[in-house]
Structures are given as C-alpha cells and as structure tokens.
C-alpha cells in the first residue's frame, strides 16, 4: 500500500502499529568500478544493504571508494561521501573519474556527527550510494557508540534502497553488514619505459570476501589494480 494511503489507516489502529518498509530488491547491484571485483560480487555491491570494506594502510581502501563513486556518478546517479577525517581531495577524485556535481561531500567534525549525517542522508531516499569513510577506525568509546547504530543504519539503507558502504581500517559492523571485503596491499608497480627510468604507478592490492549474506559466491578473491 502506498505510504500516503497507509498513514490515515494507521491513525485508526492500536498504538504500536507503525508504517513499515519493503526491502530493496536483493538482485540489484551497484557496480564497484573494478571489473575483476564485480565478477566476484556478481555485479557489484548490493543495493539497499550495508556493506563494509576494511584494510590497513596502502590496502586500496581509498582507491576502491573513488572507483565506486566514479562508477555510480557515471551512471547519472547521485552519491554522498561522509568524510570523517576530511581526507578526500576533489582534484584527485575528478582525475579518478568522479563527477563531482553528483557527489555530496560531507565533512563532519567527529564520529557522532558523522553518524547523524548518515541517518539524515539515508532518510532522504534520493541517493544511490552513501560512503561512510572512517579512515583509521574508531576510538573504543566511539566504537561502543556505533555498535548500536549499525542495525539502525542497515534498516534505513534497506528502507531507502540505498547502498551504504563503510570504509575503515578494521571490521566494525560485524553481522549487520550484508557484504564484507578485506583489502590487502600487494607489491608496488614500477612500469618500465624505453626512454626513462621506472616510475612508481601505485600498489596492487587484493580484495577478499569474508562475508556475503546473500547468495553463494564461486570465487572469493579479486585482484585490484591501482
């Protein structure tokens, strides 16, 4: 039943009966921007779900976030980046293919404000993607505060059919994440050119699926180029 028709009906029902939401289609995927990863994930990150990407320094977290934002905006969809440590560089983002006009860049002052920003963004139901970048993770106090927020954020993402992706150094959302990827840095790439010395081109990394709630994956690892 459409919400506009359901609300008048709810007013006549006993207290405690609330307006619910249907979950987003579980077969819908949001491309990650990496062909090798999308083949493993059968199309990309699940829409309407909370997904988690974690890894140490130089593991490719930022690169994957930029690829995801670039792939989303290239499809003429709108995304939001909640940048908890104010590390996003718009010039690098543009060079990575992100259409900045389709990205809402939010720079909260602390973790508490970042959480509130995510709740507001998911409540708009106008976005295809929300990336919550917690950079180097959370303090023990903040982690305890967020532990009760993950089920709420997962529910909001499902209600709005928004892909919510958490980026952090360590795993935080646990079983509330429908998809969890572990990133590990690999070897440095030094392509050789005929007329000059080798130039550093980045660090290759690998993504491993450590949790996938929906469906059985035949492959669980993917190589990610810089």
PLM regions and their residue ranges:
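Charged helix-capping and loop-helix junction motifs
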Residues: 144-152
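Hydrophobic/aromatic beta-strand patches that form the interior of the parallel beta-sheet core
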Residues: 51-53, 80-82, 104-106, 165, ...
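Conserved inter-motif catalytic segment of the P-loop NTP-binding fold
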Residues: 56, 67, 75-141
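Hydrophobic/aromatic ligand-binding patch that stacks against planar heteroaromatic rings
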Residues: 71, 92, 156
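Detector for small/aliphatic-rich hydrophobic stretches
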Residues: 1-81, 95, 215, 226
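Phosphate-binding/switch region of NTP-binding enzymes
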Residues: 154-226
